[in-house]
């Protein structure tokens, strides 16, 4: 069971609410003797941190992470021991505010009604457990996960905002760090600046599509049928707040293709195949066939809906079932998809780490 | 861990290869005292059975299921006992054939290379474990799952074939059983007949999109963060052979929407809210918010790639890494998406059954 | 969750009732390319098979096992493929009999009342799912498990029957196969023959203690805290029907020892320590410290209660709660502990296989 | 998988090392709307806390627990929300000391060698993760677990120290809190005082047996075959540091009994059977038959070996494989079994809570 845990051999359990004392996670199953410093984790957290531009929530959180367990100093620096690694991030900006507006009303598009329907009560302070704040702990866990599969690089990019898609011909990974959108298309990033400003100023919000690419994934990761690599990626990405769709490789586009166009042909690699497998002449598969990695880049995309916290009044009901209107005040992200980029990377890194360990266990060294 | 098992309280473990002795599954965790006959399971299996029209593989399989355990006769008929229910389907048409073409060559778009990369060998007879034949056992398990959540109806439909989408205004569930495509749009079904005939005769294949709708799902099913109802649906649907994308409700379309357009507003229901929750004025959420069901219909779609078994020669490599061409002979489905409809229904039914039991355990009767 | 499944990377799911059509299991997670024949599995099953002496139930079951999936013929013989291995044993001797005596009465010491309390009904035919017949499938799975840890030998012995313990000085593994009790002490075996004959003729029954020894277990198997090797062994052995106690190494005897007497001292091995670790000067630990194997033999013991199916009338209640007496007719084992020996071996083999794979995944090759 | 997690619907994940910054746990799956205060958890922790008498380690730890998440204030006090409850205990007395003696030598009877064999390194400071300090977090989790099964009381007692067993005729639960041994036999407690003083002063240690009794367990908890209530109890109790044996009810004594003596006869209860089931005339079963609770008290015992930290020099090897002697200085428990009493209670409470939720999910309200 895994309500607040994901993974099998590499397992992450998260805890904490938006406006509680602290959030954190326990990373269990990390192999021993991996070099790990708090700075490496902080670096990833800083990429997700709110309040870094006018395009994300103005909540100010330092998101300073502490390692509580699972590492020790050795002659060659701080390393993992094989024991569970607990990470803690204290909440500092839970802004004391008036909750009367949302305490008894269900915000449309949020999990207010469903948490109440499930549990009979809900933590209304900042969304409680359903807040995207929880994703900070995923990014922290992902920083550890990145170290597990030798040679893997996991990078994400915003490839669509509203109806506007990037020009794939202009894809430049170096651009990602140069704009506040993690956008790999320089021109589109410039456009998004004014586009999103308009949305922000009008108090509205907009959806986005994120693409995560993992390069250097060895062939053979994944497992048959119900532990497919793409099945686990789908669950992991769909578990991110506000995600409504996931696709691998050609994705929904594959529905429009013929077998000739879709199936990726192969040619022998110049080097020996044993190491690298064949050269694929295309990658509609997104690096996964039959649930198992092909050795090509793993490519996953996910759709993030617009945040439902907007500044215009909305029809809803209160806890007593009476009709009312609700008016969301306070800080919000005009495009929550932006900060989902490092979260998506983290989830992909965690899934790959887990499958790397599982594959090593199940099939082992030859 | 769950290589060949899915679910938690309602758990299904499947086994068997395309051309082996038999396929089957073990359904564990089914509550006791549910009426269950072999005919009910057979009825669902017959909907998926190959060879029923010229648009699916001509393999002839009776797909006769046997119940090996977990039920007993009582005064009120045959019921489940709470013990694991084992189901067995013998393979009858494993057509003795010449495997020399595919034994040492990797079919593009199939799991041939990846199984070999993972395991160092593969069962090349009809695809072995990676064959869609395994999905018959899912349909059998799904027939049991359908009985668990009181009042739930799970139905699927083919909503797109190649670039051709159905007209949603013409959606009629009664049409599903009247054409060989599970298509709810009568006119489009007529079109698909000639369209797919052309593809079939040319030895090509085409992708499709399937939509599954579950009505009568009570509010409150699902669980936070890593056991979200949509996360589990995404994993379950992505685990179906050839699926490359999954979306819930507005799905990828949500990326193009503003917060005003996307968030589903609420109004009080005329009856008491306790039972049914509010009336939602739209269903972009696809019946799920924060990973938990809203009480609206749960709507999931998945994209099925075109089968890679086509009649034109394709570039590939052999097991020794040498370049070669491969030419797939034999039976195939011109649109594997068609038979994925009952499989998709079964997966959704299984996920709902599992979450119903988990919710009952976790939150329980008030 | 694991009602009818055990293990994580090496997972066994069993099904079937005593008097149903068939019993069987699905072994998932077995590494590929292991040589495996049906004869190897049958050999282990034959050691557990009933009706082989007058000291076990006279039920006649051929216990012929079939492999339904997960293996294929290769140039070097039949091997595992990495796919789930389904094993099936048809029930042949479910003797048509009159169940009226036990249908509505709860047999003391059996699971009759508890199954009814849990499920609201029970399969009264031969004990249904709670029958020891299920253990045949464990022995079959164990035969596969034995092949996974290189160099491991798992052997069991009956070391106590009623109050009579074997003389450990006379322990000879070769004796195990020479008497119907799996007893390693030749003299005690001769005594047991007349002792158990007396019990059998009087229609009574007696308890026993079984010891399982696994030699060749590499140091390092097991995992911290809640996945300790001894924790998993305890659960696995306690899951065998009629087992009421489990101990490792000195076991309950350790409660009477001082720290000086109990802790196993170490000396360097003549060979290099890297391979074999230190030489331990005693083995009170039973080969496990901190939940992790030391490299010494793993020693586990379990207590089996006397069967509650005896020929004297017993006080009980019926399904309506009325007082009554019950008189068990029919076949029974005067000492069910005897046939628990191969079952205990199988469970230990399965736990070791699982931990071997988990260790390889978690820590991997250096 | 569950290296540092136990339970399924009620799940506990623990973290932290003996001499690290903090220890803690995440309790996931706790039902919502349970009243829970930090004082209730602290009360249980205080019973286990070291340094309360001269018979336990003199390490001074306040063991002040903080609740980081999963609760909220309501009109009727602080309650659980259904979100994961994170508990944190800061380490305060990690006494800066000289580790040179144990850093490179393996202490006999400890997990030093095995952790090193598994992970290639170990946290030698106070035993790191293998220290009994981890059990404080179990007691904290157990305090929550106690609230889940309505009407259940879980109490433990020390029933044997070295070869000295209590007189069961003198059992008085009220005595438990009146002596530093959790001993229910007043006279034996007085004896233990001088007995253990002798052992303590000589720098030696001694083993013990603990009995845990759960009253008010409803009939029907547990699950077939591999999720038996006794199987889970065995794993849970064996996972406590230094435990070498577990038994239920008559336990190993059952091996010496005949079927007539062992099987618990039944008589109708004066009240209606529906609620309470039959009256059992004895409880050799320890409240569990076929892995499912009978409604009688659940009785489990476990054997705790003497601590291996003693003041006389012991033969061992160092990390280089060279022979050496080791001399354990510092604080230790002369009988670690004493503090295992509240830990055993906590584990039993957790297993019962988990099975209560699972039963409710699986079988549900009728």
From Swiss-Prot, chains A, B, C, D:
User: Can you tell me which family this protein belongs to?
Assistant: Belongs to the chorismate synthase family.
Q: What is this protein for, i.e. what is its function? A: This reaction introduces a second double bond into the aromatic ring system.
GO-annotated biological processes? amino acid biosynthetic process; aromatic amino acid family biosynthetic process; chorismate biosynthetic process
Q: What is its EC number?
A: 4.2.3.5
Quote a single Gene Ontology cellular component term. Answer: cytosol
Binding-site list for FMN: 129-131, 241-242, 290, 305-309, 331
Q: Which UniProt keywords apply?
A: Amino-acid biosynthesis, Aromatic amino acid biosynthesis, FAD, Flavoprotein, FMN, Lyase, NADP
What is the name of the protein in this document?
Chorismate synthase
Q: Which SUPFAM superfamilies match?
A: Chorismate synthase, AroC
The pathway where this protein functions is: Metabolic intermediate biosynthesis; chorismate biosynthesis; chorismate from D-erythrose 4-phosphate and phosphoenolpyruvate: step 7/7
Q: Which InterPro entries match?
A: Chorismate_synth (IPR000453), Chorismate_synth_AroC_sf (IPR035904), Chorismate_synthase_CS (IPR020541)
- The organism named in the record is Nitrobacter hamburgensis (strain DSM 10229 / NCIMB 13809 / X14)
Q: Specify one Pfam family.
A: Chorismate_synt
Q: Name one GO molecular function term.
A: chorismate synthase activity
Cofactor binding mode, per the note? Reduced FMN (FMNH(2)).
Q: How does it assemble?
A: Homotetramer.
> Which class of enzymes does this protein belong to?
lyase
Q: Which cofactors, by name?
A: FMNH2
Cite the binding residues for NADP(+).
Answer: 48, 54
Catalyses: 5-O-(1-carboxyvinyl)-3-phosphoshikimate = chorismate + phosphate
Instruction: State whether keyword Flavoprotein applies.
Output: yes
